[in-house]
């Protein structure tokens, strides 16, 4: 190694040593600063006036739970002051030794532990001081609370004393609970003044809860007592009185246990007084509700019978008249049937229907007479009579509907006869009119379809007139033949219009085709065929189709133009 290299090496080593020394001095100074701060914090905590606060609470001569709590916190302070601070002192001394001997890592670790110890001690001291402060303040705090509780209690006592009659059977238990609360106040005063404010506070909490609970009870009891002792018995007495009057007035009831239900209600009132006496107010309220529902149910029974009596009275006054009216209607129906039987063949069901109705009316009359005769000494509940009479009224209404139906059918017979005669005359005139209408068309011939329809309609019209000329007219047969004749006339009229329309249009199109025949062989051929069908076969529809199809090729739309023009000027058949 050369001299130059040796010099550089020595300089480097010197620099490293200087840097190491500087770092060591820095770490040492930093640890010393942290240790000084911890020492000051330890002294600050140690010098807190905890001993004075402990002595102040000790001089209160606490007992019971308060004394137990004080001893626990005092022992914790003793442990801290004798052991924890000594441990911190030893750890500080050990950390200083590490720091002076340049064992900085151990010193730093030791300082961290000391900081944790001091933080825990600080928290413990704060908890001890707060607990001591609470013990010291508890007595005065209790004194303020008890004044408010006493005000509530005195107000409650005053309410009960002034309105004692409102509490009924509950008064003894309420007064007993007031005495218990008074005893709790005495127990509180003893504990609070003898050095156990913590236990006294527990007693005061219970006392306040008891006052609030009893206040709620005192609020609820009067209404329950009024309902149970006055309102419900009054309602029941009114019901009993009303029941006696109804019995005296010969009312009967479907329910046979009304007297027993009265007795059960009185027993329920007595039992519920025990709930009031024991301050079982929820049970008392429920039982009051059940009793009210039962009273309402009985009231509904009585009002039902009273209302039913009025309905029965009205029905007994109106049903005989209603029945007599229906009997008269039935007599008229019988007379109508007898009269119509001289002219018409009536179905046997009409007469048998009227006879059956007459039998039913006689049965209903017997039932009404029986009910009416028993009204002076009724043996059934009016609600039962109401149901029976309303059922009877419904049956009478059904029979009346039957009478109306029979009457309408009988009336319809004569209407159908008149209508058929009028239609027969109309159809005869229409046949003549249609015949003249066709003759005026000067057609080369009449199609067989028309002739068949014409003769069929003529024959059926003649059959209708024959039916109407019978000595005993069968109106069902008349109606059937009339329907056939009507359909025939409608078909004949439609066919007449169709024949005349196609014949007229065919003639017009044949004339119009003259402008094309001289140079259009296809139209000339169609003309010849259509004319042949028109004059020989008399199938005017087929003839129209033949010529119109040919013209449509030469002049599209020409057929519709002729059809539209015809429909605007078509001559109708004037019947």
UniProtKB/Swiss-Prot annotation:
This is Septation ring formation regulator EzrA. Residues 105-191, 265-301, 354-416, 456-526 form a coiled coil. GO terms for cellular component: plasma membrane; septin ring. Belongs to the EzrA family. The keyword Cell cycle applies. It is found in: Cell membrane. HAMAP family: EzrA. It comes from the Bacteria. Keywords: Cell cycle, Cell division, Cell membrane, Coiled coil, Membrane, Septation, Transmembrane, Transmembrane helix. InterPro entries: EzrA. GO terms for biological process: division septum assembly; septin ring assembly. Its main location: membrane. Residues 28-575 are cytoplasmic. Residues 1-8 are extracellular. The chain crosses the membrane at residues 9-27. The lineage of its organism: Bacteria, Bacillati, Bacillota, Bacilli, Lactobacillales. Negative regulator of FtsZ ring formation; modulates the frequency and position of FtsZ ring formation. Inhibits FtsZ ring formation at polar sites. Interacts either with FtsZ or with one of its binding partners to promote depolymerization. It is a single-pass membrane protein. Signal peptide: none annotated.
């Amino acid at each position: 190694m050369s001299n130059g290299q040796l010099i550089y090496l020595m300089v480097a080593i010197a620099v490293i040593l200087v840097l190491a020394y500087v770092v060591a001095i820095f770490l040492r100074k930093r640890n010393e600063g942290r240790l000084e701060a911890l020492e000051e914090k330890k002294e600050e905590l140690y010098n807190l006036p905890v001993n004075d606060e402990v002595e102040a609470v000790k001089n209160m001569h606490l007992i019971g739970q308060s004394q137990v709590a004080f001893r626990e916190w005092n022992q914790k302070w003793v442990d801290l002051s004798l052991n924890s601070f000594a441990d911190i002192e030893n750890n500080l001394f050990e950390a200083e030794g590490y720091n002076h001997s340049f064992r900085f890592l151990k010193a730093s670790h030791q300082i961290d532990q000391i900081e944790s110890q001091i933080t825990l001690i600080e928290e413990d001291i704060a908890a001890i001081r707060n607990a001591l402060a609470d013990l010291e303040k508890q007595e005065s705090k209790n004194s303020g609370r008890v004044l408010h509780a006493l005000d509530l209690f005195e107000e409650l006592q005053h309410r009960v004393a002034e309105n004692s009659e409102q509490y009924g059977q509950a008064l003894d238990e309420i007064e007993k609970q007031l005495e218990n609360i008074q005893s709790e106040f005495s127990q509180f005063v003893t504990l609070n003044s003898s050095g156990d404010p913590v236990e006294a506070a527990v007693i005061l909490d219970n006392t306040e809860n008891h006052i609030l609970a009893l206040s709620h009870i005192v609020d609820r009891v009067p209404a329950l007592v009024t309902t149970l002792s006055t309102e419900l018995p009054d309602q029941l007495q009114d019901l009993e009185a009303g029941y006696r009057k109804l019995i005296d007035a010969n009312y009967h009831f479907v329910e046979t246990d009304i007297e027993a239900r009265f007795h059960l209600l009185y027993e329920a009132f007595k039992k519920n007084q025990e709930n009031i006496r024991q301050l079982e107010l929820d049970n008392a309220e429920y039982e009051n509700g059940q009793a009210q529902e039962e009273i309402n149910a009985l009231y509904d029974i009585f009002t039902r019978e009273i209302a039913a009596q009025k309905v029965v009275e009205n029905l007994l006054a109106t049903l005989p008249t209603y029945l007599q009216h229906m009997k008269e209607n039935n007599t008229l129906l019988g007379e109508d049937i007898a009269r119509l039987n001289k002219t018409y063949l009536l179905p046997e069901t009409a007469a048998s229907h009227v006879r059956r109705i007459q039998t039913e009316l006689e049965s209903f009359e017997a039932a009404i007479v029986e009910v009416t005769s028993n009204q002076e000494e009724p043996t059934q509940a009016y609600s039962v009579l109401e149901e029976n009479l309303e059922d009877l009224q419904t049956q009478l209404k059904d029979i009346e509907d039957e009478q109306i139906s029979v009457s309408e059918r009988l009336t319809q017979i004569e209407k159908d006869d008149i209508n058929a005669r009028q239609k027969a005359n109309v159809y005869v005139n229409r046949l003549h009119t249609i015949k003249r209408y066709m003759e005026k068309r000067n057609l080369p011939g009449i199609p067989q379809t028309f002739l068949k329809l014409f003769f069929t309609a003529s024959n059926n019209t003649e059959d209708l007139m024959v039916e109407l000329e019978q000595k005993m007219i069968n109106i069902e047969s008349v109606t059937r033949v009339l329907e056939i004749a009507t359909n025939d006339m409608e078909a004949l009229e439609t066919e007449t219009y169709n024949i005349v329309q196609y014949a007229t249009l065919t003639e017009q199109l044949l004339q119009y085709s003259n402008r094309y025949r001289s140079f259009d062989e296809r139209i000339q051929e169609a003309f010849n065929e259509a004319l042949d069908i028109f004059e020989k076969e008399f199938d005017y529809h087929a003839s129209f189709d033949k010529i119109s199809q040919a013209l449509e090729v030469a002049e599209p739309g020409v057929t519709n133009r002729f059809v539209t023009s015809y429909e605007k000027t078509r001559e109708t058949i004037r019947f």
